[in-house]
């Protein structure tokens, strides 16, 4: 049984190289919120008991191109620690969000783990601040990409340990508490933790799992190419001579293709008698 290797893109291809500049891997860290309560233990805390609201502490990000070419040095981190209002309010994320805005605005794809969390908080903060939203971008979630697969845990830290043998930096509640107090050293620790989340875990998990769910994959196939391509890696597919997919209901046949690098099977979108068959319109077979 052959091992399925991690995704390897051809950055010598001008189309993939150009596309990779607009694919952003991103992870955010949010602040603690303070609540007024009468006792300890499990309890329901209502909104009117809150003293403040959730803010963004740090955002680590890097383009696919930079992560491939520079490794962990391709990750940049925006932080409240460098804002002009830090001493007065270490939770003030206005300056951070202004710096992040053009990154999101220019992105075609944003990759995150449990991406609804990151996207939701960022867009929510822009709304609260009355700022214009960035241009629409496609969100690729490394958590949702694994929905067809049952695993003991799909937390990013567990996935990185199980699949690629790396581990997130160890942290606990006290780090967030110290950040709330404006502790400069705590913010530096948070920044290092956040940067590690992007390259050592998020990016590596994406490379490791990209081939497993081609239906939901980021599409690297060049629409102007004459080749029949795999959408996952943007490289050629081989025609499986004499092998077809037959629709059980209609009896129509469709040519099959294979990715020799991953073993993935594709079928033509058009039946073999169609004039459009063999023109490059293919769809991956899924589980």
Show the residue positions of the predicted features.
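Short metal-binding segments enriched for Cys and/or His
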Residues: 255-287
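Conserved DEDDh/DEDDy metal-dependent 3′-5′ exonuclease domain
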Residues: 70-158, 162
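Acidic, Mg2+-coordinating catalytic module of metal-dependent nucleases/exonucleases
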Residues: 112, 158-224
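Short cysteine-rich clusters marking metal-coordination/redox-active sites
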Residues: 227-233, 247, 259-262, 274
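Conserved RNase H-like, two-metal-ion catalytic cores of nucleic-acid enzymes
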Residues: 2-104
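Cys/His-rich microdomains that often coordinate metals
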Residues: 234-241, 265-266, 283
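Short linker/helix segments within small regulatory modules
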Residues: 243-257
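Short, intrinsically disordered terminal segments enriched in charged and Pro/Gly residues
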Residues: 2-9, 212-220, 279-287
